[in-house]
Curated annotation (Swiss-Prot):
UniProt name for this protein: ATP-dependent DNA helicase II subunit 1
Keywords: ATP-binding, Chromosome, DNA damage, DNA recombination, DNA repair, DNA-binding, Helicase, Hydrolase, Nucleotide-binding, Nucleus, Telomere
Catalyzed reaction equations: ATP + H2O = ADP + phosphate + H(+)
Annotated family: Belongs to the ku70 family.
A GO CC term attached to the entry: chromosome, telomeric region
Basic and acidic residues composition bias: residue spans: 1-11
UniProt-annotated stretches for the region Disordered: 1-27, 39-58, 568-590
GO biological process: DNA recombination; double-strand break repair via nonhomologous end joining; telomere maintenance
NCBIfam families linked: ku70
Keyword field contains DNA-binding: yes
Organism of this sequence: Aspergillus oryzae (strain ATCC 42149 / RIB 40)
The protein's Enzyme Commission number: 3.6.4.12
């Protein structure tokens, strides 16, 4: 993606240096290569396991559709990811510049590279869609070969594709979709060669994931061949971690590969943002002359539609606009050079100018560091103190050998004693320091044993006093105990499964709609009619679970209201006649009445406010006077009295 800084002026960039700069983050780019077997059994249509879609479909076609949907999603959500489709077992052969019409022997016979491993273009997505929908091209490509295909050849072909197209990617995965659990039978040489090629892929950093498809009357048995070529653990990467969770669950021997692929797509559809390396190898000071090295990652970040570039639509074709900022003098309209611009602050009514070097020194609070100041019990950390996204830190052995051992000891101690460390935290050069709470986090696994959150430390930035606002004064009304007891049954019925909220199951509906529109425009598809919103309550399910309890609660509410009304104070109002009201009006007209003095003179308001400002007693002024002063000077008069006083002080300090 284009860098957003190129569309902003230099002065704007300087003013925002204190904000989190994400341009230096290491994004985890993903490269996925589908290896789909084309055989007679894979091309045979089978009844769908989904009762809503009873149409028969071959496993090869279903796998191609899954690859198409994945490519369709990634082209918008993760535009830097690479996806490729390799068909093996085909009658035709194609690999880069080679095909069956080429001279000489083929490097990889019966391997057809339909989509090269690259960032998918709109045309490649359309071609894959045509193949998955039984187009004219599928009749020529999807023809099974009568010869046996060597899995060693397929794995070596995948090795060359990853090496040439994605040599530096942090996440590389090979998805094998097949229904043949023993491709080589008793041929020990081919089995041994396949094991060697799989080990080469593992050493390269490629994760092989199998999506087995059971045949009718025959369950897929991974122990016959694939247990020897698939490693359970992902290859470790010292530079950056892999994804928090794998996109597909572990494939059981009796699992259906297509259903697993559909699970993969449903997980990816949440468009989770890759983890970002926030900083690398900064010292964690535990005490005087005791330092270890840690790296930090941004695991959670709010994702929103971002403008990558401005588009000019005034010509025949839309063009990307390159932003240029020019400073012009207000009085002479002369172009001002960068060296003529100086930054200044007002002190006591005078402007004090600073050189660029002095400005940098003002912002320099020291080198990046995480310094432990002390320890506090976890109970002293309130829930509302988490106001910004936390940083996840993990030990690094690059600068200080033994960092992992010390980090682990500190992590276990904080967990055991239920304490948090108070730290002085500077993430990068020229970054503003923050006081943070370093909290130890345990490893969390899902029901299938896949890691959801790794073990490590979390640094939570704590708010300063200016960041904490006072809650508005409210009167607490407590419901009667019988009413609370009835509501308890309703809440118990509405709890989520296992009483836990999984954010990956509820994607942002507005963001999904934004991506869907972009996807339709890029692929020349029909615009969708309405967005899919998984956050909407399931009203029928709610009514089924809690309908009777809600009616019982409503009956109890009527009973409690009747009790309160019966014991409430009786009204002492007496209806008066029209004659009484007329006499009161006449008496009021004869009596003199006091008028409230209202200050309407703007100069008078100005003098009063300035006098109180000199005495430091602006808070003693009434809200109408403060609002009149702000309105007279074109300032906003909305908000509470404290906000009005603050705006008045800001205005008078500038004068």
């Amino acid at each position: 993606m284009a860098d957003e800084d190129q569309y902003r002026g230099d002065d704007q960039i300087d003013e925002e240096e204190e904000e989190t700069d994400e341009s230096g983050y290491k994004t985890v780019k993903d490269a996925v290569l589908f290896a789909i077997e084309v055989s007679d059994s894979m091309l045979t249509p089978r009844p769908s396991s989904d009762s809503k879609k009873p149409a028969e479909e071959s496993p090869t076609t279903a796998a191609l559709k899954c690859a198409y949907y994945l490519m369709q999603q990634r082209i918008i959500s993760n535009p830097r990811d690479m996806i490729g489709v390799l068909l093996y077992g085909t009658q035709a052969s194609k690999f880069y510049d080679e095909d069956e019409n080429s001279r000489g022997d083929l490097s990889y016979p019966h391997c057809y590279l339909f989509t090269d491993l690259d960032v998918p273009s709109a045309q490649e997505v359309k071609n894959l869609r045509a193949l998955a929908q039984d187009g004219d091209e599928s009749k020529d490509v999807l023809k099974a070969s009568g010869e046996r295909v060597s899995m060693a050849n397929v794995l070596f072909c995948a090795n060359q594709i990853f090496t040439s197209k994605a040599p530096n990617f942090l996440s590389r995965r090979l998805f094998i979709v097949t229904d043949n659990d023993d491709p080589h039978g008793d041929n020990k040489s081919l089995r041994s060669a396949s094991t060697v090629r799989a080990k080469d892929l593992y050493d390269l950093g490629v994760t092989i994931e199998l999506f087995p498809i059971s045949r009718p009357g025959h369950e897929f048995d991974t122990a016959r061949f694939y247990d020897d070529i698939i490693y359970k653990a992902s290859p470790s990467d010292p530079d950056a971690p892999a994804y928090l969770q794998t996109d597909s669950k572990a494939s059981p021997a009796t699992g259906d590969g297509i259903s697993l692929l559909n699970t993969l797509l449903s997980n990816i559809n949440s468009r989770s943002v890759p983890r970002r390396a926030q900083f690398s190898n900064i010292p964690l000071e535990l005490g005087p002359n005791l330092k270890i090295s840690v790296s930090g990652y941004l695991l959670f970040k709010r994702q929103a539609p971002a403008r990558n570039s401005f588009i000019w639509l005034g010509g025949e074709q839309p063009q990307i606009v390159k932003g240029v900022t020019t400073q012009i003098a207000d009085d002479t309209a002369r172009t001002i050079e960068k060296w003529e611009i100086k930054k200044a602050y007002k002190f006591g009514g005078d402007q004090v100018a600073f050189t660029p070097e002095e400005m940098k020194s003002l912002r320099n609070f020291g080198d990046p560091v995480i310094r432990i100041i002390g320890f506090k019990p976890l109970s002293a950390l309130p829930f509302w103190a988490n106001i910004k996204h936390p940083s996840f830190i993990y030990p690094s052995e690059e600068d200080f050998v033994g960092s992992t051992r010390v980090f682990s000891a500190l992590h276990q101690t904080l967990l055991r004693d239920k304490k948090a460390a108070l730290v002085w935290f500077i993430a990068r050069k020229n970054a503003s320091p923050v006081l943070g709470a370093m909290v130890a986090g345990e490893e969390k696994l899902d029901e299938s044993g896949v890691q959801k959150f790794p073990p490590g430390m979390w640094i939570i930035p704590l708010p300063f006093a200016d960041d904490v606002r006072q809650n508005p004064e409210t009167t607490l009304h407590v419901a009667p105990e019988p009413l609370i007891d009835q509501m308890r049954y309703i809440v118990q019925q509405l709890q989520l499964p296992k009483a836990s909220y999984d954010p990956f199951k509820y994607p942002n509906p507005s963001l999904q709609w934004h991506y869907r529109i972009l996807q339709a425009l890029a692929l020349d598809e029909d615009l969708p009619e309405k967005p899919e919103d998984k956050t909407l309550p399931r009203y029928r399910q709610i009514d089924k679970r809690t309908g009777d309890y809600v009616l019982s609660w409503a009956d109890e509410l009527e009973k409690q209201y009747a009790k309160i009304s019966a014991h409430g104070p009786k009204s002492t109002l007496v209806k008066r006649s029209a004659k009484d009201r007329t006499s009161e009006v006449e008496d009021a007209a004869q009596k003199p009445y006091k008028k409230v003095k209202v200050e309407t003179d703007e100069q008078g308001v100005e003098d009063v406010v300035r006098a109180h400002y000199q005495k430091g007693s602006l808070s003693k002024l009434t809200v109408p006077v403060l609002k009149d002063f702000l309105n007279a000077h074109g300032r906003s008069a909305a908000g509470k009295k404290a906000d009005l006083v603050e705006r008045v002080e800001e205005y008078l300090e500038q004068k």
